[in-house]
Amino acid sequence: MKSLNFLLVVLFSMSLFSCKEKEEAAKPQATAEEQLVPPIPSADIVADEFQISPTKDTVIYHKSGSVISVPKEAFLDEKGNVITTPVALKFRMFSNPLDIYLAGIPMNFTNENGEELVFESAGMFEINASNNGKAVQVNPNNKIKVDAVSFSDDSKFNRYNLDPKTNTWRELGKDEIKTATKKEELERLPEAPIPPKEAGKFAFQVTDNLNEEDKLKEYKDVWFEPIDGKKCGFSYTKDILVKDLKNGKYEVTFVPWGKIPDTAKTTCTCYLSFKDKAQYSKALRNYKKKYAGLISKIENKRKSIEEAWSNYDKKVKEYYQFMQRKEIEGLTGSRKIMRTLEVNQFGIVNLDYPHVYPKGAKVEASFVDENGKALNLKQVVLVEMGVNALYRYAKTIHFNPKSQNILWGLTEDNKLAYFTIEDFKALKARTGKVVFKMRVHPTELKTYDDIMNVLFRS
């Protein structure tokens, strides 16, 4: 009887395993081939850190040009409780093949048919958050929104999340594509209340002489200064209405007794102003004391937007060196492409299109330096100009001879060895064994700009 029970348990377990295996097979996922290992740690793309107060909405204008909108109650602890104490949010953006290379991000994967493919990227970022040193989770009811800066408005790209536990890419559908301008971002900044003004030529006062209780008495010591600098209103009106627009501006409406000339203005928007210098000075001091924090916050955000656009212009120029497409030139300084999505989990988010390796040439590579000495290279990659992708190779190298290609890797002592566009043009072989005579930089390069200058600005 015991043997029978054991047999039933075994059969039941095998059945469960079989069902689970079929279920997993029915939902294939692309498998990443490499771990996140930066090849040159000192040149890795560093994440920027922001301190978030989870009890209020926060908008971050990142230096890349991306915009991160964090709603209140966006973070959960490991028990699923809403976090209310400060959260450290880290964000970094990857825009071109060198960014991707230096971060060590896997771009090769295998699809459900066993085919080796490579991601072409329209933008990628990593976002993480922690509270008191512990990783936090996304609140599915209050998701963070990222307007990720991109250099392509092509709809062929899909969204993928990298699962750090299984090292697999999960496809999550499409993002929303839109454009943004510097002017639009600045206009979305909150307005500080307008400071007190000194009364000018067309400033006026208002009084209520028709009612025993003066309904305009709160304005008896101030003058209204028309914003447009033009004369407004007239005497002996039936009524005067003052509406506080809540931003330091007031709308004053003059109600006439009868017909008035068409040239007379009955409504105007005004600032509050003072003719008495002592009153003006006092009002200005009170204003600065009351709104100093708000004004500083707005100016800091304005500065962040200005810096982000300046940095965006730099990244556009770098991207153009990789892509060399005419439409990219039109982005500089005028508009930027944004791809909007919600964050479902923290980690790496990729806006990509899977495609095959370059075709036209397939060679078995070995490497030597300019003196013919054999090189044992690691982290060997190829970039095809015009495609925002990174092709990682060991010995077999695929490339399109009709394209402009750059190949590079690292020597055993971490020096940059590279094969230029001109070197590829001189290469006649399309198959078989090929010895690549690499240019080796004399010193170890440790910064992004140094590597960029050698590979793409020389």
What does each of the following model-derived ranges do?
Residues 1-6, 20-21:
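Positively charged n-region of N-terminal signal peptides that target proteins for export
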Residues 182-322:
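Long intrinsically disordered, low-complexity regions that are acidic and Ser/Thr-rich
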Residues 329-357, 417-458:
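Extracellular beta-sheet/turn segments enriched in Thr/Pro/Gly and aliphatic residues
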Residues 359-372, 379:
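A short, amphipathic beta-strand motif
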Residues 46, 70-71, 112-114, 129-194, ...:
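Proteolytic-maturation and junctional protease-sensitive modules
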Residues 23-68, 72-78, 83, 92-158, ...:
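Proteolytic processing hotspots in large secreted/extracellular or virion-associated proteins
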Residues 15-18:
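C-terminal motif of bacterial Sec signal peptides marking the signal peptidase cleavage site
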Residues 20-23, 227, 341:
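Pro/Ser/Thr/Gly-rich intrinsically disordered low-complexity regions
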